[in-house]
């Protein structure tokens, strides 16, 4: 099976077989990362531009390494050091990159829908690296990959997403991906940080952490996105940690083989305790490694690849 879309803008609307294609392709990519010489000629001669209008460490570096491991020419553009500061529009920036022969544009933007707008106006393939509070599809995919790698399956699992769901594009991509793959999804957080419209997606919504964790196979912990919040959504950070922070005692309500995820960056002692973040049942560093593999798979498939040809 080959990738049938020009762009990857979100997980909402992707078929189960399309998600499986990406996850299956990521496995041999992870083998490449484990080699002493992390280089294959798969995308030699192809150009990838990472266009980031928001700060990023993990996602931007992950995409850059993913391209370089497959021999693509990878360029990073920070909006603060580009013509954006001179008033250039997103569409004009995209057309400029098109004119330079760019094959793939990886974009992160504060405005929901920005990657969709860009994709309509450029010939280059577009990958959404996070748009506002809308979606973060590659993070969702790497979370799915990590769960499947640890648990052996996705279907039938109970996954609790805990924290600031209202402002989280990661939560939305996880919801769509997990639901498509047959998992039960629970959301938990203060009522002020739980968007009511997500209840219609078929997920279960909780405001008591003890109920949300009962029998969970996986807990995906979200950080408080204070940079996106208005005041008054919860009393204090200390109070939030007391009511919704994930600690060892609360984890006793989960399955004995529970898996803990966190998309990073972590606020230790707020949404997650140190002894949880550093435990063997947490796969937080694995998520970072798997992120490179999943993004390699996406870039490879979007450039027409299929099968295991990328590993040679």
UniProtKB/Swiss-Prot annotation:
Pathway per the UniProt entry: Pyrimidine metabolism; UMP biosynthesis via de novo pathway; (S)-dihydroorotate from bicarbonate: step 2/3
InterPro entries, alphabetized: Asp/Orn_carbamoyltranf_P-bd, Asp/Orn_carbamoylTrfase, Asp/Orn_carbamoylTrfase_sf, Asp_carbamoyltransf, Asp_carbamoyltransf_Asp/Orn-bd
The enzyme's E.C. designation: 2.1.3.2
Keywords, comma-separated and alphabetical: Pyrimidine biosynthesis, Transferase
Catalytic activity: carbamoyl phosphate + L-aspartate = N-carbamoyl-L-aspartate + phosphate + H(+)
Highest taxon, organism lineage: Bacteria
Residues given in the record as L-aspartate binding sites: 86, 169, 223
Cellular compartments per GO CC: cytosol
GO annotation (BP), single: 'de novo' UMP biosynthetic process
Residues the entry annotates as binding carbamoyl phosphate: 58-59, 108, 136, 139, 264-265
Residue ranges the record marks as coiled coil: none
EC class (word): transferase
Gene Ontology MF annotations: amino acid binding; aspartate carbamoyltransferase activity
Pfam families: OTCace, OTCace_N
Family assignment from sequence similarity: Belongs to the aspartate/ornithine carbamoyltransferase superfamily. ATCase family.
Function: Catalyzes the condensation of carbamoyl phosphate and aspartate to form carbamoyl aspartate and inorganic phosphate, the committed step in the de novo pyrimidine nucleotide biosynthesis pathway.
Record text on subunit structure and interactions: Heterododecamer (2C3:3R2) of six catalytic PyrB chains organized as two trimers (C3), and six regulatory PyrI chains organized as three dimers (R2).
Annotated protein name in UniProt: Aspartate carbamoyltransferase catalytic subunit
């Amino acid at each position: 099976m080959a990738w049938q879309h020009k762009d990857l803008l979100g997980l909402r609307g992707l078929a189960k077989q399309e998600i499986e294609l990406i996850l299956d392709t990521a496995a041999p990519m992870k083998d490449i990362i484990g080699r002493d010489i992390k280089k294959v000629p798969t995308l030699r001669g192809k150009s990838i531009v990472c266009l980031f209008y928001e700060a990023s460490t993990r996602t931007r570096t992950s995409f850059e390494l993913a391209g370089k491991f497959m021999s693509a020419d990878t360029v990073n553009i920070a909006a603060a050091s580009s013509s954006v500061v001179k008033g250039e529009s997103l569409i004009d920036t995209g057309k400029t990159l098109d004119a330079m022969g760019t094959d793939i544009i990886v974009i992160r933007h504060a405005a929901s829908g920005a990657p969709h707008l860009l994709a309509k106006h450029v010939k280059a393939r577009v990958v959404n690296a996070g748009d506002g509070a809308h979606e973060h599809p590659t993070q969702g995919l790497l979370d799915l990959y990590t769960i499947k790698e640890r648990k052996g399956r996705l279907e039938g699992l109970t996954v609790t997403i805990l924290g600031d769901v209202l402002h989280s594009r990661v939560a939305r991509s996880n919801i769509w991906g997990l639901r498509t793959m047959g998992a039960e999804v629970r959301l938990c957080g203060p009522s002020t940080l739980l968007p009511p419209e997500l209840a219609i997606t078929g997920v279960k919504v909780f405001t008591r952490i003890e109920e949300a964790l009962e029998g969970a196979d996986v807990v995906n912990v979200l950080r408080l996105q204070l940079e996106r919040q208005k005041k008054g959504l919860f009393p204090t950070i200390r109070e939030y940690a007391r009511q919704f922070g994930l600690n060892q005692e609360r984890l006793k309500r989960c399955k004995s083989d529970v898996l803990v995820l966190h998309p990073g960056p972590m606020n230790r002692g707020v949404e997650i305790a140190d002894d949880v973040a550093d435990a063997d049942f947490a796969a937080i560093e694995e998520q970072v490694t798997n992120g490179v593999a999943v993004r390699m798979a996406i870039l490879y498939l979007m450039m027409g690849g299929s099968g295991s040809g990328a590993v040679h």
